[in-house]
Amino acid sequence: MAPISKVFDYLVIGGGSGGLASARRAAKHGAKVALIEASGRLGGTCVNYGCVPKKIMWNIADLVAKMKTAKQNGFPNSQLGSFDWGMIKRKRDAYIGRLNGIYERNVNKDGVAYISGHASFVSPTEVAVDMNDGSGTQVFSAKYILIAVGGHPIWPSHIPGAEYGIDSDGFFELESQPKRVAIVGAGYIAVELAGVFAALGTETHMFIRQSKFLRKFDPIISDGIMDHFQHIGINVHTNSLEFKKVEKLPSGELCIHQQDGSTFNVDTLLWAIGRAPKIQGLRLEKAGVKTLPNGIIIADTYQRTNVPTVLSLGDVCGKLELTPVAIAAGRRLSDRLFGGIKDAHLDYEEVPSVVFAHPEAGTIGLTEQEAIDKYGESQIKVYNTKFNGLNYSMVEQEDKVPTTYKLVCAGPLQKVVGLHLVGDFSAEILQGFGVAIKMGATKSDFDSCVAIHPTSAEELVTLV
């Protein structure tokens, strides 16, 4: 083993959102910090293959959906031309490249040593890095080591021909728009990408094992989005059995063989069946770090593993796999380790999240059923509203996108324990109401706020 070449206070493995946030915060507290990233690009899944490029595509798809009602809003000569997928990919890639550069400059500005290479544990305080520049292996040590390597898409490798498909990362590598796509999966990634494909004109098919998708969300979200998907022509194949095999035809099309003997041809097959922690090659056993059978690193709300010198956060821990969660957890961890804030840690309760579908949806807190299970049915009061926003007032009924809200309250004070939104502007609306709910707002607090009229959000302070 090569000798230890550098000693740090803090080694961060993984240059995604959580690792970057924790490394930079630790450096600002005066710690000597190194950040190790294998891919050669900082930003992690969110910047390179997740939130950012996805939201770019969602924005474009949402623009298309809005433009389809232009004639009904007084623009009789308005018409959509063909969509230039390749041009958008080039511009999107360039934008992501600029973000990668910004992250690297910020790391350097904060005095964090950026190490480009593949890390593996040597001991609970030592990490070996195979350097990406070909210079060989170097060994680094630190008082604390943070594992923030994120996750990766899962593939059904047991299905013959599955490799002819792509995953959510592969979506952003597509050079041209497929005419016909099959998406396998029932989570938010499958739903979001299906919405983008369909809005841009791709014939879109979703294959899900159960009767609905987004089953972990409140029914107003899963049912609301599913109803609208079917209304706009997305083909949702429910109770679908696992494919028998996938065959690549001479034409380049993919032929999906189903269990009943039927076949289905598409240009692109996208697997969105889940994600797994990216722990391959880390040699966690050398540090003694414990994981669950599925590879998730066991860590508490203070991000502590079973090894005192090793911390972990983000998707690799399986707790609320959301970028802002990893960022917040990373900063609080560094505040505790190096900033003198002894009890700093992230509260994983009441974290808002959004599904950028068409229509978009947002949620915070408990679903109606979760609230009943926790407090008892007699202690729960639910308020619902469904309406068409004023932005659809000039639009024919069949082209309107309904908005649905649900407020879940508990106890004699009717504390708001859950809020679920489906409809335009849900993400922006939820951020503000999320603050109120995090502060312990009650239904009477909501009622005491004078409505802003005319808005969709005013419905939440006028519910009866």
From Swiss-Prot:
Which residues are NADP(+)-binding?
A: 186, 189, 192, 209, 215, 274, 321, 354
Q: Which cofactor does it need?
A: FAD
Binding site residues for glutathione: 17, 24, 103, 331
* Keyword entries, A-Z: Cytoplasm, Disulfide bond, FAD, Flavoprotein, Mitochondrion, NADP, Oxidoreductase, Redox-active center
Q: Which EC numbers does the record give?
A: 1.8.1.7
Q: Where is the protein found, in the record's own terms?
A: Cytoplasm; Mitochondrion
Q: Which residues form a coiled coil?
A: none
Name the enzyme group at the top EC level.
oxidoreductase
- Disulfide connectivity for this sequence is 46-51
Active-site residues annotated for this sequence? 453
The record's cofactor note says: Binds 1 FAD per subunit.
Gene inactivation phenotype reads:
Required for cell survival. Causes proliferation arrest at the G1 phase of the cell cycle under aerobic conditions.
Q: Which SUPFAM superfamilies match?
A: FAD/NAD(P)-binding domain, FAD/NAD-linked reductases, dimerisation (C-terminal) domain
Q: Which domain of life is it from?
A: Eukaryota
Assigned protein family:
Belongs to the class-I pyridine nucleotide-disulfide oxidoreductase family.
| Function field | Catalyzes the reduction of glutathione disulfide (GSSG) to reduced glutathione (GSH). Constitutes the major mechanism to maintain a high GSH:GSSG ratio in the cytosol.
Q: What else is known?
A: The active site is a redox-active disulfide bond.
Q: Which PANTHER family match?
A: GLUTATHIONE REDUCTASE
Assembly information from the UniProt record: Homodimer.
Tell me the protein's name: Glutathione reductase
Q: Which organism is it from?
A: Schizosaccharomyces pombe (strain 972 / ATCC 24843)
